[in-house]
Amino acid sequence: MLTVSHLTKQIDSKMIYENASFTLPAGTITALIGRNGAGKTTLLKTLVGALEPSRGKVEWNQESIHHVPSARQHLFLVPDSIGVYRQMTLGELMEFYQAFYPNFERTYIENYCRSSNLDRGRRVTSLSKGQAQLFLLQLAFATNAPVLLLDEPTDGLDRINKRDYLKQLVTLLAERQTAVLIASHQLEELDSLADRVMTIEQHLVKEPKTLEDAKSSMQKWQLAYETVPDFQHNDVHVLSQTGRVVTLIVRSEAGAMYVNQTNPLLKDALPVQLEDYFLGTFGGDQHV
């Protein structure tokens, strides 16, 4: 199991995140969510060993990712861009990762290239964004790494490829009991995939919650008014207003009491989605 203890990363004088502690159990998908620039990509790069932490440690079965190079064979990061691979050919990428990952399935990735009409001599830079992203995702599956770190994995994929990839990810999880950490702004996708959710905000990485616990920490209401009030409460976040009908997120009992005191004509409870949890956590109507 991947274990993260008191992980801190500072670049120059800027604190990116500090004192992050969590685990990634086998057979789980954890969603990592946060605003743009919160530090999600930096965290993923530190977990895989591409960046050194300022403090703290990342361990695979008690072996340090940063001090024991062979421990990194248990993790694979699919980055949010192909920049680091641009001038390599597909064949060179296969050979590079086959040399590093002892359980690499060369036949798997070769079959994928044949079925997708991708010549192993093509350079990554010659592929479309979607083609390159799909190849990297299939390369991740071919490594058989027990931990996959995915940074905006479906960015650039059309709807059909996205659907097929997500199905494949679920199958992989069931068959191999892979631990997956996904950083993405595609909240609807994460809502249907993730078992757990972890937030990063103002350099604090919160311990993962189950998706059910995260959603149950908030309430979503649709209310009708004779005259819509001006909501002024830190735990009440307006999602939308259409005429005299308001949809909002309530984050606490104090917030619920405040809303009830506005005397709505009608109040309906709505199911909380991951997008609602994101908006309620990071700022409600300010970030719609």
Predicted regions and their residues:
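Conserved ABC transporter NBD signature motif
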Residues: G56-S70
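The feature captures the beta-strand-to-loop junction immediately N-terminal to the Walker
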Residues: I33-R35
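C-terminal coupling/interaction segments
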Residues: R244-V288
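ABC-family P-loop ATPase nucleotide-binding domains
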Residues: P79-F135
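ABC transporter nucleotide-binding domain
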Residues: L166-L181, H185-S252
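Helix-to-loop junction immediately C-terminal to a conserved catalytic motif
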Residues: V48
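Conserved structural motif at the start of ABC-family nucleotide-binding domains
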Residues: L2, Y17-N19
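Catalytic Walker B motif of ABC-type/P-loop ATPase nucleotide-binding domains
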Residues: L148-E152
